[in-house]
């Protein structure tokens, strides 16, 4: 899938902050409890992320047969090491890559009486290849049916000398029929912007994100169907995150 972006950076006034209610737990990010509000720092434009760079980013990912799927709804600027640290600090886990890995991990988890959150996710494609990494954030007891998850691809572009990673995040909320073959597949929350903002608050609270903002593409995608036939809708904005050295301890709640 192809697309072009006419970028508008949405920035809060200097010194402003927005309170975002958070439910559940975000691991080392320091967010816990259903009534906790983490105060997000203000959005700040990423000047090095030019329109030309954004124009080279496909609008959607696809399945192996080229059927368009989930919307690209976030990009991350930074090294692989810092990207992984941000996810780890934010309470996300790197999922297993293969079924063989899953069998071994499940056995170990069973023997140690631990829950298995890192189950593999299906391979979807961007830049002509499956995802480089998959991350999940879930209640282990409900992970079979519901899971926050995302896929990340390393792009060929750099922003200010740093790697540009491109991703798609969705929230599995149950099961539905795969319209391609009649099998059972995960159903995603059709309001995919909720998952984009869930990603924003868990990673910004990780202590590794140094800048964040939203960009609005020209002719923004506001609704479509996934490769399996499920529908989704969006305000069309894309989350931009820059990961730096940051703090290993994460942010605090108020």
Predicted feature locations:
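Solvent-exposed loop and beta-edge segments used for protein-protein assembly and interaction
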Residues: 2-3, 66-68, 127-129, 144
């Amino acid at each position: 899938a192809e697309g072009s972006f006419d970028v508008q950076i949405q920035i809060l006034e200097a010194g402003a902050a927005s309170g975002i209610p958070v439910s559940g737990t975000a691991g080392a990010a320091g967010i816990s409890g259903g009534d906790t509000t983490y105060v997000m720092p203000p959005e700040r434009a990423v000047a090095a992320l030019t329109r030309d760079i954004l124009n080279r980013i496909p609008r959607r990912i696809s399945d192996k047969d080229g059927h368009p799927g989930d919307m690209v709804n976030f990009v991350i600027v930074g090294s692989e090491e810092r990207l992984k640290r941000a996810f780890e600090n934010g309470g996300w886990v790197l999922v297993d890559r293969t079924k063989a890995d899953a069998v071994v991990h499940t056995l170990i988890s069973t023997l140690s009486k631990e829950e298995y959150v890192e189950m593999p996710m299906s391979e979807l494609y961007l830049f002509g290849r499956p995802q480089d990494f998959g991350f999940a954030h879930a209640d282990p007891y409900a992970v079979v049916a519901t899971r926050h998850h995302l896929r990340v691809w390393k792009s060929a572009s750099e922003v200010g000398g740093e790697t540009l990673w491109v991703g798609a995040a969705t929230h599995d909320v149950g099961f539905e029929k795969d319209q391609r073959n009649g099998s059972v597949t995960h159903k995603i929350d059709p309001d995919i912007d909720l998952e984009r903002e869930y990603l924003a608050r868990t990673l910004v609270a990780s202590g590794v994100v140094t800048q964040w903002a939203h960009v609005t593409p020209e002719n923004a995608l506001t609704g479509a169907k996934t490769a399996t036939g499920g529908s989704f809708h969006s305000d069309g904005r894309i989350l931009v995150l820059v990961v730096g050295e940051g703090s290993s301890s994460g942010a605090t709640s108020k």
